[in-house]
Amino acid sequence: MLFFRAFCSFGNGIKIHYSLQAMFTPEDLDLFAEKGIDVHTVEEQLASFKSGFPFLRILSSASVGNGILSLDEQQTQYYLDLWEGYLKDNHKVVKFVPASGAASRMFKDLYAFLSADYSEPQTDFEKKFFNSIEHFAFYSDLDEACLKNEGRSITDLIESGNYKAVVSNLLEAKGLNYGSLPKGLLKFHRYATNNRTAMEEHLTEGALYAASSDGEVNIHFTVSHEHLADFKALVAKKKADYERRYGVRYHISFSEQKPSTDTIAVDANNEPFRENGRPLFRPGGHGALIENLNDIDAEIIFVKNIDNVVPDRLKEPTVRFKKIIGGVLVSLQTEINRYITMLK
């Protein structure tokens, strides 16, 4: 039996005294050790659930000169040139992509349709989905799945009113299994000659604004252990194509979110939730990836989430502003190094 007592003082002046009593078995402690989580960390997590999480105090809104940098054309060109010069000197730049996010929330409306007591589209979303289904990047793959599993094409299934069979083949394991895959492995954008996953769009971006003068592009994806092999397989299948297209060489690495950053799950009474007798842990949010980020050896790292991508026709502003931001970072880095030299 472990007892934990603490005193909290929050920025808003609220002070909370609380006592926490949590019972952990030797097997629980072994689980904590396996994950690399100290028992006191677990106790602190439980205490936070009990006391609540205070809102941050907002000091002011961001504005030009107060968190927002406004550049004229001359300044913009200066930072663009600074970035291009930095890349020519072959500094190591890494594109860091959190890619463990599941796609299940993207399909919540389709899951609702599957479980609904009606069989044809009723909501605006459902009607729009089926009216536009041929425009989705996954359409051809889904059509093949329907032909294989149902013996009929998407068009035939819709014409016969079997809408749910189409959705089932999209979301479930018998078909494309999109309901269980991470966003990075989904076909996101449709092109005239091919369709791209979100991961492939990041390969494209990396070549456009993070390639060194000798064509080296470093991209690091953080993924779940469950889907690591799938990501590696997709890279093995697609990397050479994008290297030829953009005249670059990719150095792609992966890491998994560290289990030591997991958070214990609680029940309605904020007590440890157990599954099959063991405390259940859930992965921490993207903030937990700070440790993965810290492990990256690079001078400048661009961080961008896996689903924050656009098709090629919309990429120009993204590439331009990434280069500008890179130039701003180089300017700040130079200034910091100058101060360090002065202090020495």
Model-predicted regions and their roles:
Residues 20-47:
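Intrinsically disordered, low-structural-confidence terminal and linker regions
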Residues 24, 29-32, 51-54, 58-344:
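Domain-scale recognition of functional cores that engage charged ligands
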Residues 11-13:
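Residue-identity detector for glycine
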